[in-house]
Amino acid sequence: MNNVTKQPNKDYSYLRHHGDIDAAQADARIDLSVNVVDNTPPQWLRDVIAEHIPHLHSYPSEQLHQRVKEGIAAHHDIEARCVLPLAGVAEGFSFLPQLFSTAGLRTAVIPHPGFTEPEWVLRRARIPVSTQTLQPPFELEAPRGQDADSAPGTRQLWVIGNPTNPTGQLHDLAPLAEQLADLDSTLVADEAFIDTLPPQLQTQHSLVHRAATTTNTIVFRSATKTYGLAGLRCGYAVAHPDLIEQLTHLRPHWSMGTLQLVALDAIYNPSSPTHEQAKQHREQIQRDVIAHKEHLIGALTPLGFDTIEGHAPYILTRTPWGPHTAENIRQQLAAQHISIRRCDTFPGLDASWWRLAVRNPATTDAFIDVLTQALNNAHTQP
């Protein structure tokens, strides 16, 4: 593990590169770069959203907002005052600088490879950031007393994806949360992908219940990935009521639009007419991710790809080539409208790594056919 402290004059703009950019650049017909599980919201959810379009002349309802809080709370068996609907997890990350300042923390810690948006937000706010670059298989290392940045008395903000994007690693964060509590530090767990996993893994690894009852843990969740809602921005935070109140005061009025609230209500509210459909959809996605991932890895392995074993609706795989050749092939695929998430913008990785979204077998087979053809036609060297 390597620790790297902020360099004041370094350009960190690469941290804002996300999979949607790769998809747009390729004008993708086969999109393997964006981690949204479905390429469209389910029909029942589209119908619910469409029903409310005629009512957009009205401001978002506070009653609906409260109902969404109560529905999400019931979904997790926590109190509604521990929930805050968000315009996607990205909005939650936008709160980090203020949380850091208010809590009197001294440094932020970001393990990598990991989702880069939190680091970009913190660095833009000129908050000291210590990155921890993990080596394959990218298992998390907790702070150690002899490390300067984690010595007793140093109050930290840790931000970790669980499962982590792009590695797919699922961490046991409970011991880390306990250790950080002893240091009077804060843990933010980004669980944007966790509801694509089997329920038993969610129960074992989610910090939702800890977040609702302690003041040093915040969880961000997303409906984007499982329900195909990236364009609508639907998520929520779970935290102690005091922290939820603090986050609420950071937001402008009417920060959640009507259609966002309607979608969240349809998905999570146990009294919603679509609740059972949402549950069935979620369970089907969980089964599909396992089966479709196995198909994808099975197709890549004979071609020499080495895939990290992870728990997510995407895989991180090392290509059989060096960075230059791997990027050339990725660009060849992009020219044929197949998008692959480049990984050299993830600290700790280079262009020899690809992140691939898990798709249905037909889509995977179409990708493999084009990839195989590109390899047969290419004159490459490592």
Region spans (language model):
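Active-site phosphate-binding strand-loop segment of PLP-dependent enzymes
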Residues: 130-200
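PLP-dependent aminotransferase class I/II
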Residues: 42, 63-66, 216-308
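PLP-dependent enzyme catalytic core of the Aspartate aminotransferase-like
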Residues: 335-336, 347-382
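Conserved PLP cofactor-binding pocket of PLP-dependent enzymes
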Residues: 17, 309-312, 317, 336-358
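Conserved PLP-binding catalytic core of the aspartate aminotransferase-like
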Residues: 290, 298-336
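Phosphate-binding glycine-rich loop
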Residues: 67-107
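N-terminal "arm"/small-domain region of PLP-dependent enzymes with the aminotransferase-like
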Residues: 1-59, 74, 357
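Conserved PLP-anchoring active-site segment centered on the Schiff-base-forming lysine
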Residues: 99-123, 128, 132-135
